[in-house]
């Protein structure tokens, strides 16, 4: 987008063009102005999350029936968010870390950079810049995860087994 009106779309050397181009991309990716990206939730101890993901959207009323609340204990549907709003479950650090219900705006961020960690970081940063609070549930730090070499090896194994995951880049 040529936001500066100088006749060039310059996302490298023009901050206004870069920001306007990003905003245009998000709009084309179904960003909904005035709607949240998501929020941290509390799930009941007996909750079965098998088969759930950020892609499998359910109405907030259904999540409520299954025992979810916002992390502060308040209802999921409040303010300008109705009980029919669709959200998916995201637990980026597994069962020992924070869990989120994410909406279409999270998906728009994800489409810009296909990494849940990126989308979550950008979404949370935007909340914090507007006075939002930090995540309540601590992020587990005792699990080092797997190394880049181990990720590459796993990707190579998937490719050898016929899965089309693109290049093994770790």
Regions from the language model: what does each represent?
Residues 1, 23-31, 127-134, 159-163:
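Sec-exported extracytoplasmic/periplasmic mature domains
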Residues 1-5, 98-104, 132-135:
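Short acidic (Asp/Glu) and glycine-rich catalytic loops that position anionic groups and cofactors
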Residues 3-11, 169:
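Acidic, glycine-anchored loop motifs typical of Ca2+
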Residues 123-126, 155:
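Generic hydrophobic alpha-helical scaffold/packing signal
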Residues 135-145:
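Conserved alpha/beta core segments of nucleic-acid transaction machinery
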Residues 2-3, 33, 70, 165-166:
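Residue-level detector of short coil/turn "hinge" positions at structural boundaries
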Residues 146-151, 156-170:
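Short acidic, glycine/serine/threonine-rich helix-capping segments at coil-helix boundaries
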Residues 8-124:
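Long, repeat-rich segments with strong aromatic
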């Amino acid at each position: 987008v040529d936001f500066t009106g100088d006749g060039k779309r310059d996302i490298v050397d023009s901050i206004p063009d870069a920001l306007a181009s990003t905003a245009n991309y998000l709009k084309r990716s179904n960003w909904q102005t005035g709607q949240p990206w998501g929020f941290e939730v509390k799930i009941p101890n007996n909750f079965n999350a098998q088969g759930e993901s950020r892609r499998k959207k359910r109405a907030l009323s259904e999540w409520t029936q299954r025992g979810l609340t916002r992390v502060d204990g308040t209802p999921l549907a409040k303010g300008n968010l109705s009980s029919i709003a669709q959200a998916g479950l995201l637990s980026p650090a597994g069962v020992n870390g924070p869990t989120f219900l994410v909406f279409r705006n999270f998906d728009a961020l994800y489409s810009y950079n296909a990494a849940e960690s990126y989308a979550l970081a950008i979404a949370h940063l935007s909340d914090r810049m507007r006075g939002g609070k930090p995540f309540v549930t601590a992020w587990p730090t005792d699990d080092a995860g797997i190394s880049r070499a181990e990720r590459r090896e796993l990707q190579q194994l998937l490719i050898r087994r016929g899965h089309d995951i693109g290049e093994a880049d770790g």
